[in-house]
């Protein structure tokens, strides 16, 4: 009989999808198990028969499914306003250029966000965060990028920090100052990149406001040379990097990010075999964002088969943002990744657990249920993990556990 220490908490009588690749069963499944939690971490996984029949802090889950807490590794959660009218214009035939000339596009969100009070931004972001948490998300990446000036980029990162401090969720904040060229630098994008590299990155890093630097390397974003300046600046300061790359065209952004051992290359619809090989060599995770693919009615799919062949880890994320992926649902992203991109349900689950953790540099502590990892997990009214992927809109979450506490 397993002896429990005072303060231990146990979840017993569970079907456990560990997502541990060392377990041979699909999803790392093991039946009739119990989880022992101590000090906010998983202490042990033991067979049900090794536990006392009852006791304090022992929760009987009556055979329910338990998985790691979900991880959304790519979001733009903090912004003001929406772009619904712009979307309607596009569907009525207006071009992106026409909408931009009217003040639409990303700079519309930038203007609204700059004008928005910090507390209002917090309340807007918290409501979105709670929607994700209600689906079982326990770790969430949040990018800046709707400030495009020092003061507002800092404001967005402070909101992310407050979300982490005041709610039962982990936040991984990312500086995405190199998201777009702001209106005041329209004719001088190189000058804006200088501002990013010489002012924003070092000053905001010194304040401890972010974990990684991101950029948008694309024909409608920044070119390879401009992107490399951002990567060089970050790496010189010891900051992990990642990139929005190969979404609308093939510029070689994935190879560039991988040369700097990037945490992830995101979107990657136009990724080629050389880029896939570079990602393998750089230890870079591929992050699929099917919401943007769907919303923009794109047709070029990511090279999933090449990613499998080169054994590049693949994550899946919501990319929640007002312009190209207004879907605040990781369950929906999992379903879309299967239906649109051809992932298996097990690959989609890996994409929101252990591979998403790797995309955030948290693979040693998050994304699996195993001894020593954080006690962030979800209890579902379901028998199989595929049920959560299969039916978006139905949420069978029974219990969300964060740092060993029911939340």
Curated annotation (Swiss-Prot):
Under which EC number(s) is this enzyme classified?
3.5.2.7
- EC top class, as a word: hydrolase
Residue positions binding 4-imidazolone-5-propanoate: 83, 146, 179, 247, 324
Spell out the Gene3D superfamilies in the cross-references.
Metal-dependent hydrolases, Urease, subunit C, domain 1
Q: Where is Zn(2+) annotated to bind? A: 74, 76, 244, 319
Cofactor annotation remark: Binds 1 zinc or iron ion per subunit.
What cofactor does this one take? Zn(2+); Fe(3+)
**InterPro entries xref list:** Amidohydro-rel, HutI, Metal-dep_hydrolase_composite, Metal_Hydrolase
Q: Which coarse location class applies to the principal site listed for this UniProt protein?
A: cytoplasm
Q: Which residues are N-formimidoyl-L-glutamate-binding? A: 146, 321, 323
Q: Where does Fe(3+) bind?
A: 74, 76, 244, 319
Write out the GO MF terms. imidazolonepropionase activity; iron ion binding; zinc ion binding
Reactions mediated catalytically = 4-imidazolone-5-propanoate + H2O = N-formimidoyl-L-glutamate
Compartments in which it is found: Cytoplasm
Pathway per its UniProt entry is: Amino-acid degradation; L-histidine degradation into L-glutamate; N-formimidoyl-L-glutamate from L-histidine: step 3/3
Disulfide cysteine pairs (residue numbers): none
Q: Which GO terms describe its biological process?
A: L-histidine catabolic process to glutamate and formamide; L-histidine catabolic process to glutamate and formate
Q: What does this protein do?
A: Catalyzes the hydrolytic cleavage of the carbon-nitrogen bond in imidazolone-5-propanoate to yield N-formimidoyl-L-glutamate. It is the third step in the universal histidine degradation pathway.
| Name of this protein | Imidazolonepropionase
Q: Which gene encodes it?
A: hutI
């Amino acid at each position: 009989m397993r002896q429990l220490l005072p303060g231990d908490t146990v979840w017993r009588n569970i079907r456990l999808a560990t997502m541990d690749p060392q377990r041979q069963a699909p999803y790392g499944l093991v039946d009739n198990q119990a989880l022992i939690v101590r000090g906010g971490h998983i202490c042990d996984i033991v067979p049900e028969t090794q536990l006392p029949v009852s006791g304090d802090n022992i929760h009987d889950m009556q055979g329910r499914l338990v998985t790691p807490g979900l991880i959304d590794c790519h979001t733009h959660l903090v912004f003001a306003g929406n772009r619904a009218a712009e979307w309607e214009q596009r569907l009525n035939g207006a071009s992106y250029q026409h909408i931009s000339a009217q003040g639409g596009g990303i700079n519309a969100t930038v203007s609204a966000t700059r004008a928005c009070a910090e507390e209002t931004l917090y309340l807007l972001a918290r409501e979105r965060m709670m929607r994700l948490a209600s689906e079982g998300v326990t770790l969430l990446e949040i990018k800046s990028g709707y400030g495009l000036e020092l003061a507002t980029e800092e404001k967005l990162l402070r909101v992310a920090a407050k979300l982490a401090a005041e709610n039962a969720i982990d936040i991984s904040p990312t500086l995405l100052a190199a998201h777009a060229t702001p209106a005041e630098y329209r004719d001088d994008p190189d000058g804006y990149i200088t501002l990013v590299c010489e002012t924003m990155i070092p000053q905001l890093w010194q304040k401890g406001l972010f974990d990684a630097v991101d950029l948008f390397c694309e024909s409608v974003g920044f070119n390879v040379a401009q992107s490399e300046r951002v990567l060089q600046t970050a790496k010189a300061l010891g900051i992990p990097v990642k990139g929005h790359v190969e979404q609308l065209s093939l510029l070689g952004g994935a190879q560039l990010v991988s040369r700097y051992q990037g945490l992830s290359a995101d979107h990657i619809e136009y990724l080629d075999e050389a880029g896939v090989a570079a990602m393998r060599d750089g230890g870079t995770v591929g992050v699929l964002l099917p919401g943007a693919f769907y919303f923009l009615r794109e047709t070029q799919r990511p090279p999933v088969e090449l990613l499998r062949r080169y054994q590049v880890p693949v994550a899946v994320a919501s990319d929640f943002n007002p312009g190209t992926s207004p879907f605040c649902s990781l369950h929906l992203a999992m379903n879309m990744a299967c239906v649109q991109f051809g992932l298996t349900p097990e690959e989609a689950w890996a994409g929101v657990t252990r591979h998403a953790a790797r995309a955030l540099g948290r693979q040693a502590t998050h994304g699996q249920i195993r001894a020593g990892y954080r006690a962030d997990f979800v209890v579902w009214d379901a028998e199989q993990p595929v049920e959560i992927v299969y039916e978006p809109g139905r949420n069978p979450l029974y219990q969300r556990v964060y740092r060993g506490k029911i939340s």
